[in-house]
UniProtKB/Swiss-Prot annotation:
GO molecular function: RNA binding; structural constituent of ribosome
Signal peptide stretch: none
One of the GO BP terms on file: translation
Annotated PROSITE patterns: RIBOSOMAL_S9
Pfam families: Ribosomal_S9
UniProt xrefs under HAMAP family: Ribosomal_uS9_B
Any one GO cellular component localisation term in the record: cytosolic small ribosomal subunit
Xref: NCBIfam families: PRK00132.1 (NF001099)
Name by which UniProt lists this protein: Small ribosomal subunit protein uS9
Region (Disordered) location: 97-134
Record's compositionally biased regions (Basic residues): 115-134
């Protein structure tokens, strides 16, 4: 099997139920999310800015890399944060010297909060049924 000449970094990010796989390779700045363009999948500017913030921190010119993102599960905001974490981890694989910059901005921190399970005898995870003393 021939070795590929394209050097790429692959990393995974998670948030709640969202899982994102990010492929980072040298290129012209093309971003592909689940077969769609970046602007189509994430229509809000704040979402795109959040995702690309690790890349802006490391490089001045964002057109150095092509991104291929596969994301599934969760809601849009969970997918945004999962993709940001995946991109930060891919940049870290690309160059280990970036660790201090990424860590100081909190891009390498995985948010551990998940949905709390529903308990029996309760309506929801913490909400109880109405209590009647008499």
């Amino acid at each position: 099997m021939a070795k590929s000449t394209i050097q790429e970094s692959v990393a995974t990010g998670r948030r709640k139920q969202a899982v994102s796989s990010v492929r980072l390779r040298p290129g012209s700045g093309k971003i592909d999310v689940n077969g769609k363009s970046f602007e189509d999948y994430f229509p809000l500017e704040i979402q795109r800015t959040t995702i690309l913030s690790p890349l802006k921190k490391i490089t001045e010119d964002q057109s150095q890399y092509d991104l291929i993102i596969r994301v599934s599960g969760g809601g849009i905001q969970g997918q945004v944060i999962a993709t940001r974490l995946g991109l930060a981890r891919a940049l870290l694989k690309e160059n280990e010297e970036n660790r201090q910059d990424l860590k100081s901005c909190g891009f390498l921190t995985r948010d551990p909060r998940k949905k709390e399970r529903k308990k029996y005898g309760h309506k929801k995870a913490r909400k109880s049924f109405q209590f009647s003393k008499r």
